[in-house]
Amino acid sequence: MKVSLVVVCHHSSRVLSQCVESFRREAAAAVVDAEVVAVEHSEDAAELARVEAIGVDRLLERPNRGYAAGLNSGAAEAGGEVLLLANPDIRFFPGSVSALLDGVERGFDVVGPQFAWDDDGHVLLPAAEDPSPRAEFGRTIRRRSPRVWSATLGRVLDEAWRLWTAEETLPVAGLRGALLTVTRETLSRFGPFDEGYFLYYEETEWLWRARRRGARLGFAAGARVQHRWGHSIGQSDGAADREENSRRRFVARNYGPMWRRILRASGGSSCEPMQVVRLGDETGVPQAENDLWLASQFPHLVPAIGTVRTGAMPAAFLDFCRARGWVMASAKRSDGKWRITGAWTWAGDGV
């Protein structure tokens, strides 16, 4: 079997080498032929040379028409029966490629990994949200209503626990687009990515389209992959506007008039549904009895990054949260029910 890693790059050479090296190592461990196809969007000769020096098998220089266009170009040129469609700011942990391929062999049409924030793979990124209009309405109401938030907290944490503690590939309603594993036949069946999305929501739209046509999406819990998101876009001017424009395009094209009216009517500012203790700038998070540590930029904790039974969050991640005024929360499961045992933030005037 030949497996092609298709990577869309934009001034990404400083992170691409780890992506390529770790992929080749894990492809060898999985005993498959490996190919790396890089689509370079920087339109910069020096950057093109740096990517070429990394040793990719195919280097495609293309004008920057967006991430979806890059994926389509790379997939068309790739020679593998299985394609890993990827951001460059990822690193494969041991066993990850084997676990992704196992998910495909088990009959899932699209398979994604468990993403981790840190080098050790302990701080876990949240699974992708269900993009259906009904699920989006539920999230909107939870953000606005403390009563609904409390009533649905257990279900939200149960799902996080189900995925973060799993070992096999599980069915899910959505996947994160930093790495998607598909066969060439699957990509042909569901069509190319919509190049009307320059950045953000292109994978959401493609997965929603595939799911509505019967695709099975698999979350390969045994495939752990580090994702250092934002290396290229970071906090660049216009990033938030681009994401919002893509979101609006997705809603306009995929939700019917009734759902669009419902979501507009239910929108509004988020609530703070639990007591959050505000800490001094240099104060650490107190110890707490828990099964999950959760961290989110939102007071309602959705979505949340987390760790499972680690005792404490890694210091580097605490510093990350402190610098951004994120909310940290401790959650304990007892007799099948969840409760928040503490919540803290470093934000001075609200979260």
Locate the predicted segments by residue.
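Short, well-formed alpha-helical segments that are part of the catalytic scaffolds
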Residues: 12-27
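Glycine-rich, basic loop-to-helix element that forms the pyrophosphate-binding segment
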Residues: 61-78
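Short aromatic/hydrophobic "clamp" motif used to bind/position activated sugar donors
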Residues: 83
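Active-site-adjacent helix/loop segment of glycosyltransferases
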Residues: 207-277
